[in-house]
C-alpha cells in the first residue's frame, strides 16, 4: 500500500506543475498532460517515487544517519521547521548562508556562539550588561536564532539533504553535490532531476502539497528512529489505471485557483542590518 493515497494528493494539489513555458524538458517523463497552460504531474509516478523515498529515509534514519531539511520560501518555511522538529532532525528555513556545508567549521563556531548567548539569556547574565551592550547582544542572539536555530544540535555535516524547491535552494544543492551528500528533493516541473539522488515529482509551491509530502518524509524518518507509525491511508490500493483517469477528471476544471502561486514571483529574504 502506498504511503499516500491518490485522493490525498489530488486534494493537496500535488499534481499542479508550473506554466508550460517555464518547464525543464528533463521533467518530461513525469508529466501527464497540460491544462490551461499548466503542466500536470503524473501522480502514478509520484506515488511510486514517494514510496521509494519513504523507504530510503526510513532505512537511513534507522541506521542513525542525520537529515537536514532545507526550504526557505514563504510557503515551505513553517512546514520545514515543524516537520524537522517532529522527527528529531535539523533544518534551515530562512536563508541559506554560503558555506553552511562546505565551510561547516566556521558555521559551527557561530552555532556554538548562539548556544552560549542562549545560556547567558537563560541565567540572567545579559541583564547584568550595560543597557546598550545588552541590546546589541540580544539583537545578535535573535539573528543567530533566526538563521541557525535549526542547527543547534547538529555537530557534524548531515548525511542527507531534504530539499523543497531545488531551484531556489540551488546553493544548498551545489554544496551538497560538491561534498557527495545525497539529496532527496521535491521535483516540480521546472526542476532538474539530474541534480537529485531521490526525487519526488510534486508541486513545490502550494502549502498543502509541501505539507503532505514533507510530512510523509518526516514520518519515514520518525519511523526509522522510533518504530512503526499507524497513519498510512486505510483505503484500498488504487489500480494502476485509476490515477490517470482520476487526474483527467481533476484537471478538467480550470486550474488557476490551485496554481495561482505558480507564476514568476519569488519570495526572498532581505539582508538584515547588523
UniProtKB/Swiss-Prot annotation:
Organism: Gloeobacter violaceus (strain ATCC 29082 / PCC 7421)
Protein family according to the UniProt entry: Belongs to the universal ribosomal protein uS2 family.
NCBIfam families on file: rpsB_bact
Membrane-spanning intervals of the chain: none
Keywords attached to this entry: Ribonucleoprotein, Ribosomal protein
GO BP terms: translation
Residue numbers spanned by region Disordered: 255-274
InterPro entries listed in its UniProt record: Ribosomal_uS2, Ribosomal_uS2_bac/mit/plastid, Ribosomal_uS2_CS, Ribosomal_uS2_flav_dom_sf
Keyword Lipid biosynthesis: no
Gene3D superfamilies referenced in this protein's UniProt entry, alphabetically: Glucose-6-phosphate isomerase like protein, domain 1, Helix hairpin bin
One Gene Ontology term, aspect cellular component: cytosolic small ribosomal subunit
Protein name, UniProt field: Small ribosomal subunit protein uS2
Molecular function in Gene Ontology: structural constituent of ribosome
